[in-house]
């Protein structure tokens, strides 16, 4: 007799206008199994998981857990059934603290008023112990101590450098991703859905997470692990299901297939895992930053006396652990953040603390780390997003009128050239309709189409599939060949080494180390990224000169 799978999804169908996202998909997950879910962006993975989490209702098909058929009309239904989910796109409230976001929606018991408690200590004993007062405390969080201690312990346990009392808006993308992971770890679940959970984690942090997942599965928790990183599939996944164009291509044991096999299942063709970086002689400097210092959104110094020179036809890779000043450096170079000291020139023109528009007009293009928040307008059409920085150009109209025919043709050309999928009509499809990888390709297409002198790319391949990664990396190297200076910020060390001509390591807002791909030592770079290099102080003193003169 065949044992009933812990989770069974049968013949799941979900269609949106113009596209069938899930076409009769079957998925089974065993108890205590880490089950991988692979597929290109737009293959239907997120849609399938949103159905399982009650965010979407399937058009057809059935879902059962432990043999019991489920009706999931809302996330609360899923939570009540013991299903938790970490979303790829953040679902946080910026004005709340980390701890408040983690416990949001939890039915926390009220903390009784105590004579020695800060909250309610001034009330008489009869009032503090009154059942009605305690009930109101539970309903309205009166006197409720937010369980920050447990959340902080979780954060420390998994190596998350995060203050759980900080407001979410004060955090960078990497730290916000960790809050999402904490939200899932905080709850006891039978089935945990992880949608790209390690996208912004360091290898060490990812290893800690993997250890925790294995402990969870030892306790009988089942995990669906959505990832684009094939090495993660090999490391932690027991079986993997591959989706392509909304259909189930197959389910295989990871021990029976190679990375190349999985990649070919995902995209339907052989995928190249290395890039051909042809030799290009760097030209004149296009960017010079001298003794640049800047503060973060909280007014705390994030950059300290950074020197950086980028030449035409050169890719300068910036490596570092999230939260060490990379975000602020990218925004300074793109004109989105003012400097507190130092100067910045582009093609010899002083742009220190100039407006973002001035940077754009002087040939600076920018791919931000958060494509949804800073790189696009989700409610606007693909057409509008494709020309977002260029409405002033004569080809798109004159005065207060716009040539929508030209705008449409421009967007369609970019969609075709960069293989942006899921767009049947650029005037109807919105940026918010696109999957992460396709939105990233649209943003990169927009920035490159401006023929920039300097391209600043911050985490350009974060959270995208192997096929999209291949095309994005090729596009960056094409810009290098055409004489564009490129600043590449990435937490993917292999990407930095493969694409860069020079590599700088940033730690606590300073450039502490410089090397080349030919001389790169991954262990040394990793140590420098965490401040553990034996010669960090010496290297820092030397490199502050090297970064500006190489």
Curated annotation (Swiss-Prot):
It is an enzyme of class 7 (translocase). One of its GO terms (cellular component) is plasma membrane. PROSITE patterns: ABC_TRANSPORTER_1 (PS00211), ABC_TRANSPORTER_2 (PS50893). It catalyses: D-glucose(out) + ATP + H2O = D-glucose(in) + ADP + phosphate + H(+). Its main location: membrane. ATP binds at residues 39-46. Residues 7-270, 287-533 form the ABC transporter domain. Its EC number is 7.5.2.-. Keywords: ATP-binding, Cell membrane, Membrane, Nucleotide-binding, Plasmid, Repeat, Sugar transport, Translocase, Transport. It is a peripheral membrane protein. The keyword Transport applies. Residues 529-550 are annotated as: Disordered. It is found in: Cell membrane. Disruption phenotype: Mutant with a disruption within tsgB13 or tsgD13 cannot use glucose for nitrate respirative growth. However, the mutant can grow aerobically using glucose as the sole energy source. It comes from the Archaea. The complex is composed of two ATP-binding proteins (TsgD13), two transmembrane proteins (TsgB13 and TsgC13) and a solute-binding protein (TsgA13). Part of an ABC transporter complex involved in glucose import. Responsible for energy coupling to the transport system. Belongs to the ABC transporter superfamily. This is Glucose import ATP-binding protein TsgD13.
């Amino acid at each position: 007799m065949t044992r009933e799978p812990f989770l069974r999804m049968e013949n799941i169908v979900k269609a949106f206008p113009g596209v069938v996202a899930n076409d009769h998909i079957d998925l089974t997950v065993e108890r205590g199994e880490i089950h991988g879910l692979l597929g290109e962006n737009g293959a239907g993975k997120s849609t399938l998981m949103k159905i399982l989490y009650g965010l979407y209702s399937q058009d057809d098909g059935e879902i059962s857990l432990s043999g019991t058929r489920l009706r999931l009309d809302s996330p609360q239904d899923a939570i009540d059934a013991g299903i938790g989910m970490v979303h790829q796109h953040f679902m946080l409230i910026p004005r709340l603290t980390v701890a408040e976001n983690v416990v949001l929606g939890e039915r926390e018991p009220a903390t009784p008023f105590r004579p020695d408690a800060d909250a309610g200590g001034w009330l008489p004993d009869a009032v503090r112990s009154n059942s009605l007062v305690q009930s109101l405390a539970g309903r309205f969080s009166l006197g409720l101590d937010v369980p920050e201690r447990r959340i902080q312990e979780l954060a420390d346990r998994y190596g998350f450098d995060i203050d759980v009392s900080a407001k979410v808006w004060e955090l960078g993308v990497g730290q916000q991703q960790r809050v999402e992971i904490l939200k899932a770890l905080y709850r006891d679940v039978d089935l945990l859905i992880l949608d790209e959970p390690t996208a912004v984690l360091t290898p060490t942090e990812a290893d800690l997470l993997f250890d925790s997942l294995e402990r969870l599965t030892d306790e009988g928790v089942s995990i669906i692990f959505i990832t684009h990183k094939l090495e993660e599939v090999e490391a932690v996944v027991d079986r993997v299901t591959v989706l392509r164009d909304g259909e189930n291509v197959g389910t295989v044991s990871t021990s029976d297939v190679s990375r190349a096999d999985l990649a070919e299942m995902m995209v339907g063709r052989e995928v190249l895992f290395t890039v051909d970086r042809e030799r290009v002689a760097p030209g004149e400097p296009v960017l010079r930053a001298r003794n640049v210092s800047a503060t973060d959104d909280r007014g705390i110094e994030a950059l300290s006396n950074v020197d950086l020179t980028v030449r035409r036809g050169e890719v300068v890779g910036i490596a570092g652990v999230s939260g060490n000043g990379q975000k602020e450096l990218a925004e300074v170079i793109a004109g989105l953040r003012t400097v507190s000291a130092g100067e910045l020139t582009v093609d010899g023109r002083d742009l220190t603390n100039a407006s973002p528009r001035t940077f754009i007009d002087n040939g600076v293009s920018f791919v931000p780390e958060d494509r949804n928040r800073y790189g696009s307008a989700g409610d606007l059409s693909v057409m509008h997003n494709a020309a977002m920085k260029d409405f002033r150009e004569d080809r798109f109209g004159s005065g207060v009128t716009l040539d929508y025919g030209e705008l449409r043709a421009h967007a369609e050309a970019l969609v075709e050239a960069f293989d942006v999928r899921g767009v049947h009509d650029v005037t109807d499809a919105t940026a918010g309709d696109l999957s992460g990888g396709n939105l990233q390709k649209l943003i990169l297409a927009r920035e490159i189409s401006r023929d920039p002198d300097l391209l600043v790319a911050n985490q350009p391949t974060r959270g995208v599939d192997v096929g999209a990664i291949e095309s994005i990396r090729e596009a960056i190297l094409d810009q290098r060949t055409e004489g564009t200076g490129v600043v590449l910020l990435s937490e993917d060390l292999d990407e930095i080494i493969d694409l860069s001509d020079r590599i700088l390591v940033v730690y606590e807002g300073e450039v502490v180390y410089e090397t080349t791909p030919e001389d790169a030592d991954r262990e040394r770079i990793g140590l420098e990224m965490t401040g553990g290099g034996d010669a960090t102080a010496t290297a820092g003193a030397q490199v502050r000169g090297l970064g500006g003169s190489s």
